[in-house]
Amino acid sequence: MRIAILSRNENLYSTQRLKEAGEARGHEVDIIDTLHCYMDITSSNPTVRYMGKVLPKYDAVIPRIGSSITFYGTAVVRQFEMMGTFCVNESVAISRSRDKLRSLQLLSRKGIGLPRTGFASKPDKIQDLIKNVGGAPLVIKLLEGTQGIGVVLAETNKAAESVIEAFMGLKANILVQEFIKEAGGADIRCFVVGDKVVAAMKRQAAEGEFRSNLHRGGVAQLVRLSKDERATALNAAKAMGLNLCGVDILQSNNGPVVMEVNSSPGLEGIEQATGKDVAGLIYEFIEKKAKPNANRTRGKG
């Protein structure tokens, strides 16, 4: 099969692993810089151009779209969908996952476990917003933040008020969530491919830190999922419409709760922690599912 990886940096671990794994299985794999793609959308024969040439017909596209280029990146994915190319994650699903509020609303509608959450831009009563999620300690997040950036733990109601007022001064949209103290600074990353959790790792925050992101110094280890945790991860991926994603779960007193669904999860941490060939499992999925016009939205959304 001929497969394209959309990635801005061919030297990233995940990009390199996907290329190596694909070629090891006999596929022809091209790495394409998403931002250097440009599209012909005026004709009845949609194409994607790159480096002055029309790109060839691909059997599948693996989007590795960074959050900073979501708008343009999803437009490129949508163009491939319009051409009938199978995209591992569809443009609509990627867009959903990048909108934290929309993601939580979709998960809530499906009855998937979530931390108590409030959303605000200019709340008239900050105290009521804080009270509504159970009071301090609580977590305040910028909607646009990634890798733990723009996430603050407020230990007291007064501190929470100050942080919310500061974010309001920046005209930022914020989420206010209950702090799951019983998780002990740890979360579980479930790597979903198709309808299976193919790998899972537990990430423990560094000492004195509540964010477990590996970019923040967290450490990862192999973990065995409970039946509820596995079901929660699969239901979250299904609700978002993602074939490939990382679902981050906290273990609360009320069962597993979803913190985030990542449509472009990194491979380095999960492969090193579990010893699994996750990149190869992604190609197994592609080999089974990649057919012309197999996308559900087919570029319509």
From Swiss-Prot:
Recorded GO CC terms: cytoplasm
Q: Which residues form the ATP-grasp domain?
A: 104-287
Annotated residues that bind Mn(2+) 2 are located at 260, 262
One GO molecular function term of this record is: ATP binding
Alphabetical GO biological process terms: protein modification process; SOS response; translation
- Into which EC class is this enzyme placed? ligase
Residues binding Mn(2+) 1 are: 248, 260
What's the domain of life for this entry?
Answer: Bacteria
Q: Quick one: which residues bind Mg(2+) 2? A: 260, 262
Name the cofactor(s) required for activity, per the record.
Mg(2+); Mn(2+)
Residue positions annotated to bind ATP are 141, 178-179, 187, 211-213
Q: How is the cofactor bound?
A: Binds 2 magnesium or manganese ions per subunit.
- Give the matching InterPro entries: ATP-grasp, ATP-grasp_RimK-type, ATP_grasp_subdomain_1, RimK, Rimk_N, Rp_bS6_RimK/Lys_biosynth_LsyX
User: Which annotated residues bind Mg(2+) 1?
Assistant: 248, 260
Which UniProt keywords are present, listed alphabetically?
A: ATP-binding, Ligase, Magnesium, Manganese, Metal-binding, Nucleotide-binding, Protein biosynthesis
Q: What is its EC number?
A: 6.3.2.-
Family membership noted in the UniProt record: Belongs to the RimK family.
PANTHER family associated with the record: RIBOSOMAL PROTEIN BS6--L-GLUTAMATE LIGASE, RIBOSOMAL PROTEIN S6 MODIFICATION PROTEIN
This protein's name: Probable alpha-L-glutamate ligase
